[in-house]
């Protein structure tokens, strides 16, 4: 068995990355044994052959992640090599620190690993720079089975102009978690469809029930990701910033509208005061008001709902639907992924690399080894395998099930770059604090965004 160790990777940096990084690790993806495509038949036939029938092939596989992810991945590599003894996979792994810079240098110099893990926020910039960095999974349908993924998940994760340059390692997304006991007592229903305006009315009912309670809690980050961005997408039908044109997808009046909505949430006591929440940063579950059930619901992510639930053991929590305005032009909510897996466009062994990734995603033994080290599995067979093991249940799975029902456009690219995120988050936070009118904040925000876009 391969031992857990770091493989040193020495490269000369050809350039530095200007792409927005996101090295968020989650859990995993797994797969099941019920494969139906030609890819399955091809691999099964290949597996019956001996090493003597093939020239030896060595693949490099680069990823980041903690010890649990690393050991599980190494164990899958071992299993694959036992079934395909003519293929050797050299593992190159470590932490996320410096990973993007190393990846950039290797892509530019043509020395990148045959198989590599990719940050979702980085990929649009890489594809724009040179789509040839990546092999298209659609070109290998006889080796890699894409049918086990939901089409909408593939469309929003790793697909560019119809080319599947990456496949998601898991399913994640925005979530709303709520205290079902409190909601039932007050007469609030998050299990049915509702609008942004309905949230305000729900908040008023909470105040009538208990003036010290709030319907919602959220941090400054969620103000942007859970209100500003989806609201604008629903209102305009466009992504916030348009990658193709390098223009805004909204007008100043649209931003004024969403900022006025945020102002209403805080003026009416629908959302807990930002001055109270800000002290807890991203750890909303440590807020005593959450622990003491003074908040009915919280905006968050599928990867954090279990933490929020665990912080209040006396509560009875459920995953709720997400708000969509009447006559929305885009639902604004969508599944995304923690990371992508990619095959190098420069690899001399793309078929074998695809064979390994098909095993990684679509093999029952691999699924049982990987469990959930890269988030909720993105494939139907992977989810079934995890369900059989009893490790895919509860509020995280419920929140993922809900986010999968939405078909909004993934606003990945310019909108999610670090500078833009900071601009939008700051605008929403200013209004939440009452530090500027929606009109004034919108005007200054437009100026900052246009200045940013002019540099692109």
Where are these regions (language model features)?
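Hinge/lid segment of periplasmic solute-binding proteins
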Residues: 44-46, 50-52, 120-173, 197, ...
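Short, well-ordered beta-strand elements
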Residues: 55-66, 87-92, 114-115, 165, ...
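Extracytoplasmic/periplasmic substrate-recognition and gating elements
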Residues: 78, 82, 88, 186, ...
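Extracytoplasmic "Venus flytrap"/periplasmic binding protein-like
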Residues: 79-152, 181, 185-187, 288-297, ...
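A structural signal for short loop-to-beta-strand junctions that line the ligand-binding cleft
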Residues: 106, 113-114, 144-182, 215, ...
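Mature extracytoplasmic/periplasmic domains
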Residues: 132-134, 138, 303-307, 339-418, ...
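Extracytoplasmic/periplasmic solute-binding protein
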Residues: 161, 165-169, 174, 200-254, ...
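Glycine-centered hinge/linker elements that transmit conformational signals in sensory
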Residues: 203, 245-279, 322
């Amino acid at each position: 068995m391969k031992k857990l160790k770091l493989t040193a990777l020495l490269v000369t940096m050809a350039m530095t990355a200007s792409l927005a990084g996101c090295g968020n690790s989650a859990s995993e993806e797994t797969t099941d044994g019920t494969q139906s495509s030609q890819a399955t038949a091809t691999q099964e036939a290949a597996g019956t052959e001996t090493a003597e029938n093939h020239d030896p092939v060595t693949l490099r596989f680069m990823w980041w992640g903690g010890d649990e992810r690393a050991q599980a991945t190494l164990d899958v590599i071992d299993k694959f090599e036992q079934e395909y003894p003519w293929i050797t996979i050299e593992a190159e792994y470590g932490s996320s620190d410096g990973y993007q810079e190393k990846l950039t240098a290797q892509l530019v110099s043509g020395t990148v690993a045959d198989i590599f893990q990719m940050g979702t926020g980085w990929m649009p910039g890489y594809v724009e720079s040179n789509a040839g960095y990546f092999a298209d999974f659609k070109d290998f349908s006889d080796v890699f089975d894409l049918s086990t993924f939901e089409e909408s998940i593939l469309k929003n994760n790793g697909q560019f102009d119809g080319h599947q340059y990456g496949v998601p390692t898991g399913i994640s997304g925005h979530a709303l978690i709520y205290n079902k006991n409190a909601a039932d007592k007050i007469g609030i229903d998050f299990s049915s469809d509702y609008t942004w305006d309905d949230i305000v009315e729900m908040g008023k009912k909470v105040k009538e029930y208990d003036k010290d309670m709030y319907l919602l809690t959220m941090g400054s980050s969620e103000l942007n990701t859970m209100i500003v961005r989806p609201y604008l997408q629903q209102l305009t039908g466009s992504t916030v910033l348009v990658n193709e044109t390098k223009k805004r997808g909204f007008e100043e009046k649209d931003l004024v509208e969403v900022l006025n909505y945020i102002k209403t949430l805080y003026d009416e006591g629908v959302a807990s005061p930002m001055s109270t929440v800000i002290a807890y940063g991203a750890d909303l579950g440590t807020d005593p008001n959450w622990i003491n059930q003074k908040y009915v619901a919280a905006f968050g992510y599928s990867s954090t709902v279990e933490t929020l639930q665990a912080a209040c053991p006396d509560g009875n929590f459920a995953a709720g639907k997400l708000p969509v305005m009447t006559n929305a032009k885009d639902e604004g909510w969508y599944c995304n992924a923690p990371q992508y897996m990619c095959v190098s466009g420069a690899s001399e062994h793309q078929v074998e690399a695809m064979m390994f990734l098909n095993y990684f995603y679509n093999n029952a033994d691999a699924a049982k080894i990987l469990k959930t080290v890269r988030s909720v599995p993105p494939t139907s067979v992977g989810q079934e395998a995890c369900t059989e093991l009893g490790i895919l249940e509860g509020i995280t799975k419920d929140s993922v099930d809900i986010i999968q029902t939405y078909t909004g456009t993934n606003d990945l690219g310019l909108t999610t770059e670090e500078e833009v995120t900071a601009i939008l988050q700051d605008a929403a936070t200013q209004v939440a604090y009452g530090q500027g009118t929606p009109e004034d904040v919108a005007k200054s925000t437009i100026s900052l965004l246009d200045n940013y876009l002019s540099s692109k």
